Amino acid sequence: MSKKRLYEIAKEVGVESKVIVAKAQELGLSVKSHSSSVEEADANRITSSLKAGTAKDESKPAPKATPTPKEEKVEPKVDKASVAKSAPAKETSKAEVKEASVALKKPKSRNFKAEREARAKAEAERRKNGGGRDNRNRNQQGNDQGKRHNNDRRNQKGNGQGDHNKGNRDNSTNHDRNFQGKLRNDQNQNNRRDNARNNQAGPRIDLKARAAALKAEQNAEYSRQSETRFREEKAAEQRRAKEQEKARKEKQQAEVAVQKAAAETKPAPKPAPVAPQSAPTAQVQDTRRKKVRPNKSRDNRRVNEDGPKQTRNNKWNNQNQVRNQRNSNWNKNKNKKGKNNRGNSAPKPVTERKFHELPKEFEYTEGMTVAEIAKRIKREPAEIVKKLFMMGVMATQNQSLDGDTIELLMVDYGIEATKKEEVDNADIERFFVDEDYLNKDAMVERAPVVTIMGHVDHGKTTLLDTLRNSRVATGEAGGITQHIGAYQIEEGGKKITFLDTPGHAAFTSMRARGASVTDITVLIVAADDGVMPQTIEAINHSKAAGVPIIVAINKIDKPDANPERVIGELAEHGVISTAWGGDSEFVEISAKFGQNIEELLETILLVAEVEELKADPTVRAIGTVIEARLDKGKGAVATLLVQQGTLNVQDPIVVGNTFGRVRAMTNDLGRRIKTAGPSAPVSITGLNEAPMAGDHFAVYEDEKAARAAGEERAKRALMKQRQQTHRVSLDNLFDTLKAGEMKTVNVIIKADVQGSVEALAASLLKIDVEGVRVNVVHSAVGAINESDITLAEASDAVVIGFNVRPTPQARQQAETDEVEIRLHSIIYKVIEEIEDAMKGMLDPEFEEKIIGEAVIRETFKVSKVGTIGGFMVTNGKITRDSSARVIRDGVVIFDGKLASLKHYKDDVKEVGNAQEGGLTIENYNDIKVDDVIEAYIMEEIKR
């Protein structure tokens, strides 16, 4: 009997796969997932049970809506009086609930209710004794009397000195009485406090508990005194403000009176009466000046009969004198500006420092100064310096303190100290590991990132080419993929992002990077070749990254294809098919003819649905660099894969050890876009330098922060590189001496993309030839320039160009300085050539000789022929039997042979300098205007 997969049954019935899995498990079938297979009879049982359950649900009648009984609608009769009585209770309960909620919101503080009850109890005892009442009455009488005298003196303008002194004596007498009453009250209060402490004192049982109680009592006492002092200062400040306001109003009234008097005296016809009118004023001024100043000094030194000298009344005396002086207009030069009139204005009252409560928590950083701590806890630096001195720490207000000292200081103040965690702004990795960076409520489904991996020439690029309906594979030199590419396709309304990784052994690091950012791995295995070394390596990378594997057995159209052998070989390496009880999906395809491609895409979407891939598009974008290169006109170009967030044009970005702003952004089709969401591959420009492939990137809030982070990362990378020094030890002494005797092959590597530079350098360093080693003097991205030739001449190195060409100036300088330039487009040929040269087996029988260059001026597409390029020879000549390279923007696009060469309509063997002609190239039709055609021949060298 045939078997069926559970997801096929789900498609037939029209339900989700998980429903079928649950029903199968309910029927007792041993299934694990939607990919499990069952017999046809079991499939019929599952289908019939599902249909029976659906029919049973439909047969159930819909529940009728039960009408609300009428008794519930009838409102009961309620007594209005009872309602009126219950209303205040409800209001009271609401108020109590409100007060309780407010009390819960407030921070825990002292028990003011208990303190009020204690004060009320003490007041009742004082009233019962009667002593406090007499003092209060006497104080009140003295205050009233002093107020009456002071008011009388304020209302009288220009009175004599005798009345003024009388008012001062009355005030001083009243103040003496107030002072004596206050002394008695303080004494009673101290007695009550001592009695209370004596009553509370008990036998000491636990020293720690007693110490804690004493400390709590001291804190409570300190809080009470602080609050009392704060209230007294606030009341005194309010009194001073009222007095100043009153003095200001009196001054305004006096000025208005003077202006009225001046207005009345102005229209007098004769100036003679004016002198007698001002004479008494001057006389009063002179007498006032003579009387006031000596009396003022005597009053300050006077000792009262009832007690010691009192200083509070002097404030009232001084204010009265200032008012009298203003009213009498005795200082005529008061309003004049000058050096001698600075002290004429009344001194401003000194504002006392406000009292602030100590904070309950204090967040500190290592190295805070005493002044910073004092500002944070609202205390004087001198107070903190004193506390530190008592703790045995000598410090000034500008001295930094360590964390332990700050914590001890906060314990002394009774404040909970916590250390502030310093956030490294230059650390990009924190965005990838911090769970709080993403908003879980804003998570949406994202497209899966699929990496196509496999051995060399097993059909990875051909499969991707079939998926994209393009011809990427035909443009690859030697038929292998040189660097990673990212593309996005759409299947059934859902997008899938594909990463194409190279299969050559030199690109191990690039495959590892591809596996680290992927969600699903599609392992391509040729049905005729089976499992190869890079296939095993791809399996290990996928297992290390923890991503599911979908095996695509390719080339099933070949006669010698054996898919069963491939399944058995993969099972030996831990990749077991679901048909054999494993968890890996196997799909047999033919990438060349497009066979079973739809089934492969459906399997990818099915596995992605099981993985439940989510992303937050609302945060700032983070992701990974897929590839980076230097473009002649655009500068540094980086291919990025957005993993979280949304990337926008003009975003400040930090990529690896460089930074910049996103100037332009294009998708995989070359179209300019403004935004890119999660799982989208984009190519951006605007970076200062080309980053390394595999670096992480993150978008920052502004360009200033991005610049600071990028410069800091570059500085750290440089310091790390400088610290990598090779120290001589006994273990490596022999190796060091041996290395001095070895011959060295110095090379300079220039490639088109960063990934190829890394792979080529790593492969050359791995070449193991006894007595010879490779030293990579310099490696970079871009065309070969004059500085590379200069460096090669100084270090006696060979310049290796991978998919790049030297500039004309560099080529001329290389010929002058006799520097060897090796140009290649296939990586294993570079490795073989360097290895043969190191072994002394290189046989330089032929040398490449460039015979001419031409520029494409126009292109013509002819059916059954291809693209014809109309060219003009700019240097040398183009021959029919020569090989040709297509160079675009300094990068080799294609290398092949000429298919035809014509001058006008005639077939010719060569076209000379400054002549025009037409040509076609074998197996290449992507000729464009301004492409450079470089013709060369392989010439035998005399040994």
UniProtKB/Swiss-Prot annotation:
Molecular-function GO term, any one: GTPase activity
What organism is recorded for this protein? Streptococcus thermophilus (strain CNRZ 1066)
* A single GO cellular-component term on record: cytosol
Q: Which UniProt keywords apply?
A: Cytoplasm, GTP-binding, Initiation factor, Nucleotide-binding, Protein biosynthesis
HAMAP family named among the record's database cross-references: IF_2_B (MF_00100_B)
Q: Does the keyword Metal-binding apply?
A: no
Record flagged with keyword NADP: no
Segments for region (G5): 590-592
User: Which residues take part in binding GTP?
Assistant: 454-461, 500-504, 554-557
Q: Where is the composition biased (Basic and acidic residues)?
A: 69-82, 112-137, 145-155, 163-196, 224-253, 296-309
Q: Where in the cell is it found?
A: Cytoplasm
Region annotated G4 sits at: 554-557
- From the UniProt entry, list the residue stretches annotated as the region G2: 479-483
Q: Which gene encodes it?
A: infB
- Name the segments for region: G3: 500-503
Span of the secretion signal? none
Q: What is this protein called?
A: Translation initiation factor IF-2
Q: Which residue intervals make up region (Disordered)?
A: 29-357
Question: A Pfam family matched by this chain, by name?
Answer: IF-2
